[in-house]
């Protein structure tokens, strides 16, 4: 077990998406919350945990997103030229991860209320349980619109299914994907 799991951690922040559900021409992560771009709140927590080992994946309005990020921290960037999903965005960031990294945390750039303590707790649990992958999920009374977390009889994650692709049975699942992984 790693003595200090925070020592060799990198964080990837996904900020390349179009944010089409917001019905705005502005990149979703640039919308202001409490006078700052949404992504700046995520960066505060990420940098508190990983220092300068933070990689922001940019795409839509990349230059504006980079500008907003650099106003408040020293981070690296990876460009996702085509928005081809979360997995592809992570692949775009992988070359920027330092070789000394032992754990990678993946965050969405649109979770401004995420606290550094939550990230640390997720990582500590991930390391303690010696998992290959940890997904932060939440149970909602009304999960409409969210990706469902499908778990087998052994309590293992089998897949994440988006609402549009879910069967009626899967739509009844109340555990949803937060988009936060380790």
Residue ranges: model-predicted function:
Residues 33, 78, 160:
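Hydrophobic residues at beta-strand termini and immediately following loops
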Residues 15, 58, 108, 137-138:
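Short beta-strand/turn micro-motifs composed of small residues
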Residues 9-33, 49:
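Glycine-rich N-terminal loop/short-helix segment of MobA-like nucleotidyltransferase
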Residues 63, 73, 114-182:
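Conserved core of the sugar-phosphate nucleotidyltransferase
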Residues 30, 77, 133-135:
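Conserved beta-strand scaffold positions in the cores of enzyme catalytic domains, especially
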Residues 2-6, 23, 48, 96-99, ...:
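Solvent-exposed alpha-helices and their adjacent loops that cap or buttress functional pockets
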Residues 1-9, 37-108, 112-124:
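Conserved N-terminal catalytic core of the sugar/cofactor nucleotidyltransferase
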Residues 17, 110, 152:
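Acidic active-site catalytic centers that drive phospho-/nucleotidyl reactions
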């Amino acid at each position: 077990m790693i003595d200090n799991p925070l020592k060799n951690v990198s964080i990837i922040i996904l900020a390349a998406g179009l944010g089409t559900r917001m019905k705005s021409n502005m990149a979703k992560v640039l919308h202001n919350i409490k006078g700052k771009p949404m992504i700046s709140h995520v960066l505060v927590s990420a940098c508190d945990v990983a220092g300068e080992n933070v990689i922001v994946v940019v795409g839509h309005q990349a230059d504006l997103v980079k500008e907003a990020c650099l106003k408040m921290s020293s981070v690296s960037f990876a460009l996702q030229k085509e928005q081809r999903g979360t997995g592809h965005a992570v692949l775009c960031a992988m070359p920027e991860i330092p070789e000394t990294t032992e754990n990678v945390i993946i965050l969405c750039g649109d979770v401004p209320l995420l606290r550094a303590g939550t990230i640390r707790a997720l990582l500590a649990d991930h390391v303690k349980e010696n998992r290959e992958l940890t997904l932060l999920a939440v149970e909602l009374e009304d999960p409409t619109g969210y990706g469902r977390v499908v778990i087998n009889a052994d309590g293992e994650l089998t897949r994440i299914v988006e609402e549009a692709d879910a069967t009626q049975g899967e739509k009844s699942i109340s555990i949803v994907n937060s988009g936060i992984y380790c």
